[in-house]
From Swiss-Prot:
Subcellular location: Cytoplasm
Protein name, as recorded: Small ribosomal subunit biogenesis GTPase RsgA
Database matches in Gene3D superfamilies: Nucleic acid-binding proteins (2.40.50.140), P-loop containing nucleotide triphosphate hydrolases (3.40.50.300), Probable gtpase engc, domain 3 (1.10.40.50)
General function of this protein: One of several proteins that assist in the late maturation steps of the functional core of the 30S ribosomal subunit. Helps release RbfA from mature subunits. May play a role in the assembly of ribosomal proteins into the subunit. Circularly permuted GTPase that catalyzes slow GTP hydrolysis, GTPase activity is stimulated by the 30S ribosomal subunit.
Residues binding GTP, per UniProt: 136-139, 190-198
EC numbers, comma separated: 3.6.1.-
Gene assigned in the entry: rsgA
Native source species: Paraburkholderia phymatum (strain DSM 17167 / CIP 108236 / LMG 21445 / STM815)
Organism lineage: Bacteria, Pseudomonadati, Pseudomonadota, Betaproteobacteria, Burkholderiales
Pfam families assigned to the protein according to its UniProt record, in alphabetical order: RsgA_GTPase
């Protein structure tokens, strides 16, 4: 019979568990199921969060305790540089953590949503991520002039727009994209039909094999993009994180103060408003509204700001 007290036994057990903990990188997420790649390069395994709440994201560095050869429990999330997510009145949807940049995939056709583009840019600015806009399918010549015209506003704001034809000119597209992606952790966002999956397959030759491996580990049986997953970029320290296509991008969690600073064209004017607590909606002496009136700020950009402020006001904080 052990001579140690129950308290000492509990401490010893906790110490044993701590010694069993392994560092890893979350490379896929689907619901409360996560795939973790161990730091030592051993086989990936399925992990679950400890407790009911789960705030784990792809790109997180974690500590987990193995519970079997291919499963474990995540017990700690490492310090994050950032966390990108979207939210509505009721819930949040995590995209990824520890990012450097955001790659927003658009196409000449089908018609892309400028509202979603604008929201993605705001999210990037608020998280201090570099946004890259990719215009795909430039070989569809009839639709190209209108797409370019719609993106002129964003070029004028200083955003990088990369024009590619992933299917028509794959080698040129690969060279263009790799020049901007290598060495960086990049989240890929886009509506369905824009060519996001084609882009992944272009840059990650074994993407389909990796997807099947993760699907098997998640026991999902599905080989479509129903989960967010991270791919190491071949020959680079960078990573590409692919997320499911989406049709909404709520930013209800952003306060008015964060929103005004997420519009780069607003920033130089914020100190010029007559009132220090100006909302930039209908106040007299508002430098932002004056810039909208004389064309220095696009009306559609201010309309997006006003809509986001309205949405944020619906949240009880």
């Amino acid at each position: 019979m052990s001579g140690r007290s129950p308290k000492a036994l509990r401490a010893a057990t906790a110490n044993d568990r701590a010694q069993d903990r392994v560092r890893g990188l979350v490379i896929a997420a689907h619901g409360r199921h996560y795939i973790v790649a161990p730091e030592d390069g051993s086989a990936i395994l399925q992990c679950f969060p400890r407790g009911k709440r789960s705030e784990i994201a792809v790109g997180d560095q974690v500590l987990y305790e193995p519970t079997s050869a291919d499963q474990g429990v995540i017990v700690e999330i490492g310090e994050r540089r950032n966390l990108l997510y979207r939210s509505d009145q009721y819930k949040s949807k995590l995209f990824a953590a520890n990012l450097d940049q955001l790659l927003i995939v658009l196409a000449t056709e089908p018609h892309f949503s400028e509202d979603l583009l604008g929201r993605a840019l705001v999210a990037a600015e608020e998280n201090e991520l570099k946004p890259l806009i990719v215009l795909n399918k430039i070989d569809v010549e009839a639709a190209l002039p209108l797409a370019r015209k719609r993106l002129q506003l964003y070029r004028g704001l200083g955003y990088t727009v990369l024009e590619v034809s992933i299917k028509g000119q794959p080698d040129a597209a690969r060279a263009t994209l790799e020049a901007h992606l290598n060495g960086h952790s990049t989240l890929l966002l886009g509506q369905s039909g824009m060519g996001k999956s084609t882009l992944v397959n272009l840059l990650i030759p074994d993407a389909e094999v990796a997807t099947r491996e993760i699907s098997t580990a998640l026991n999902s049986g599905r080989h479509t993009t129903t989960f967010t997953r991270l791919y190491p970029l071949p020959g680079s320290e960078g990573a590409l994180i692919d997320s499911p296509g989406f049709q909404e991008f709520g930013l209800h969690h952003l306060t008015e103060g964060k929103l005004e600073r997420a519009f780069p064209e607003f920033r130089p004017l914020l100190a010029e408003c007559r009132f220090y607590n100006c909302h930039h909606l209908h106040e007299p002496g508002c430098a932002i509204l004056e810039a909208v009136a004389d064309g220095r700020i696009a009306k559609e950009r201010h309309a997006l700001y006003a809509q986001l402020v309205h949405e944020a006001s619906q949240i009880v904080r």
